[in-house]
Amino acid sequence: TPFKPQPNPNIDMTRSIREQVLQHDKLLFYPYEAMNPFLDLVHEAAYDPECISLRITLYRVAKQSRLCESLIDAAENGKEVTVLMELRARFDEQNNIEWAERLEEAGCTVIYGSEGFKCHSKICQLTYREGMALTRLTLLGTGNFNEKTAKLYSDFMLMTAHPGIGEDANLFFRNLSLGNLRGDYRFLGVAPVGLKPLIMRGLDREIQRALAGEPARVFFK
């Protein structure tokens, strides 16, 4: 029988995903674990009165996308929804154009990235207002927000309430909307300016540790 992605053992699908991420970071490992916690979180946000905005980058989306339907629901429920849709994703151009049109019709703000560059980042941020305070959940992936390919390709998805990562993600989306490629980030490495130097510094650090006989490790996905 075909392999079926399994539930993440650290996530209770009968409880609010938002509350669980606030308590502790969650890591999904596709295709061995199902994408449902992420999809449920976005769906929850679309109907959560405390959620005020949803922002996401989309490179390849499924033709039948539960994620995009939730973004449409969120916009129709009066939330601020911003979508960066990459129209130059090879072989998926028409599908992305069709979803971009549907998202715009629902009231989402759709932007198309910077001239001369493809946006390949996989990042989503949900912002909530609790009284006078704002909280942010940030979702970072190595693969597309795509229900179909998440069952096929090996990728990670981090769901976190880390304040510093949340501030970086907020700045990232602000810079995207302004076409600014030179943001100054504390935790995120963002191409085309900041990612390579960050990686090279990390490699140099581990090289020096290894030369000094100290424990050293490099792990890439």
Where are these regions (language model features)?
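N-terminal localization/anchoring segments of enzymes in phospholipid and broader phosphate metabolism
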Residues: 1-218
